[in-house]
């Protein structure tokens, strides 16, 4: 009896491991194929994309870096993402503080507004915005696009910051008030240091979203000089269809920094995903 | 005291102003433009009433897009949800390997749609240099790129998007499952519940609020889906993967019929708004806070 129970448990455990490994492989195999083929030339990729490289073409990387203009692209990506993060941190932390404490008359209204704003399609405001930006000569301006992505990511950031502020005990604020702290002192001296993990979480979630964004970025950034790394990478696709080794090397240049960054900040990233979605 | 109240309005102002200028006002402009024949250039477009809506409702491709969005929704509320739940439940008991699995599952989710789409396009689906090409040319199997057939393109695009998305659900579901009160689990085990009963009567009720919110979010975003479709097929072949979003985008930037694009965008927004109401209703507990 006991034996068969543990036998059953064991086979269940093996099965569950097998399922998890299968799904892990489904995530990893396509990425490994990219890495593997980034060292091969077109001929050997066409012969067999699943084979180990016979000769290692490290030059694919240098060629890809040149062809996609990644030097320029990464600088633009950093400027754009940095703009988005700074704007979102400033606006969302202040708004989160106000909404968490129910400090204004229209708290409910503002909350509903940002909930709707979070789920509205980008196409709802994209077209008029595009033609206004064109009029203002702001197409191709990475900072302007950074601001737009700031507005797009703002609602989620506000709700994240709000939940971080709500975890601060009310008494802390009250005692600071009794000691005569102004709102400014209260926020910069007490609140902001306490929600620092929240600021980090918001920066990471919003930063990755802005870095990866496609619809807004590709619509507004025209002209090679304003291309982000992503757009530079995409511009390869038509020209280098017959040089897949170069395409794969460019993909690795796109993928590797992001995966490394993700592994470094994993705790904050997962915290952000979860607190944005899990309802208690 | 009075000053302090005024300060609070000042603090919310940057967020409201930013959203007003970039989301709300252009959004209202879309509402206006939807009833005009604006081409994006003209200074004074003429008001044409419901004509844009009449024309899109008569367009076969509009209905095709709507139907594709509906199919997309059905695929997304089933496949990734089932995979996410299954893997989350399996990870619940793997205390040591849990975080490693979570990280691996999130890899595709963290990467840009542009990178993921190009990856599948070039090394998997490509009929010359991809795995598909290898199976066809070297092993002699009779397959073509699933993206090039009107019968399979939608499923192929959805597969790539689902491949990138399901890990997110695993992480969210797992976090919710872990909040299930321990005493409830113990009580159920003492009562002799088997694994399925434990899930059905203890774990699932506990994660239900999260589960419903995620379902609503999936429905909303299924009606807005753009990136993978646009990058992998651009809506083709023969509109077989056309979505409302790509349909609107083509009107605005290929045909310069901005009025029409706006009317499609408005239609999408109304669909989204209905789902948003559901979302707000489900998170009404947050509003009390």
Predicted regions, residues:
Chain A
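Short, intrinsically disordered terminal tails adjacent to the first/last structured region
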Residues: 1-4
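A structural signal for multi-pass alpha-helical bundles of membrane permease subunits
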Residues: 6-8, 12-280
